Amino acid sequence: GLEALALSIPPTPGQSIVKRPNNKNLFTLGSVFRSKGYNSRFIYGGYGYFDNMNEFFSQNGYEVTDINALKPNEITYENTWGVADEDLFKLAMKEIDKDYKNKKPFFAQIMTVSNHRPYTYPEGRIDIPSHTGREGAVKYTDYSIGKFIKDAGSKPWFNNTLFVIVSDHCASSAGKVE
């Protein structure tokens, strides 16, 4: 899951390292980039206290930005998990633009929320109605990522930026702990 991405290790079965006690000052991508002068960010479309993400990321080299950084007029759609991916990507763009303006290289781990049950997203963006299942959520996520990359293409930092797109967990990472 998230720890696999942050720690560059295979997903762990059972309880996520993100949720476990004594999980601070670990060797994470965020801490490595921070030690090299980068602003390392974890940007999440929901509330960072969910699943202990605020604590884990903030104690492991990341600055955490979540739904609380958005003003009410910046939220065009919200469901039980958080804001629409488009709203999250606009927030991420604003944070990245700040880093660029301050002449700081950046590393941003951005976590969207639309591709989770109940699979809801803003109407009219894609040809599959909201609330109808995973296929629509995946297509909306694809639409939002495409829009983000296209919008980023007009930014002065774009040509020096690597985009890596992965899921936050896979179906096979669950397991039992003895």
Question: What is each stretch, according to the model?
Answer:
Residues G1-E178:
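Solvent-exposed soluble domains appended to multi-pass membrane proteins
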